[in-house]
């Protein structure tokens, strides 16, 4: 969300560098941590992409929402950007989407063309006061990301680390909820009307592990599907109903 042209200018570098550094992935239930590389698909913000009530799918909605701005003008912030962020956050809240990040891009070239500006820290402080409450880390500053300087590189690396961390946190949380839903569904398999087709959604979990190159976990998911489905095949072959 936010300044689409700004994001477009940064996207090639972002998509290339985000997966380069591995992240330690710690899961629940005492499972050993794994080192993974995060590859993300960035899509333009649309309300119809947000999760709907009762939708248990894992890969059909965005995990982390990012608002991009390079606003450094007092009046522009008051009259445009603040209202835009408010509307964006209200839509997220309506869909219980709580994982977000506001990126304020600092551009020396843009500041030189403006006269009615606040110091960069003041703009960031305003955004944090208006929207972040106790989550001040949800607003980050990116200093001249397209400029070849040590300051810009340091800022860019810090941003990538923050983005990887938030992506992994959101992914782990959503994955855990999905696993809990599937676990609850599996435990009801002896009840009348239980649907294997609905449970077959767990294959989506296998797709996730494949993308993360966690092949042992992938095999476990397919073995579990096979163990549950085989009795249905045997029962059907004996003249029963699936």
Feature-to-residue mapping (PLM):
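Eukaryotic intrinsically disordered, low-complexity segments enriched for acidic and Ser/Thr/Pro residues
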Residues: 1-200, 235-242
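Short, charge-rich amphipathic alpha-helical segments embedded
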Residues: 215-216, 220-242
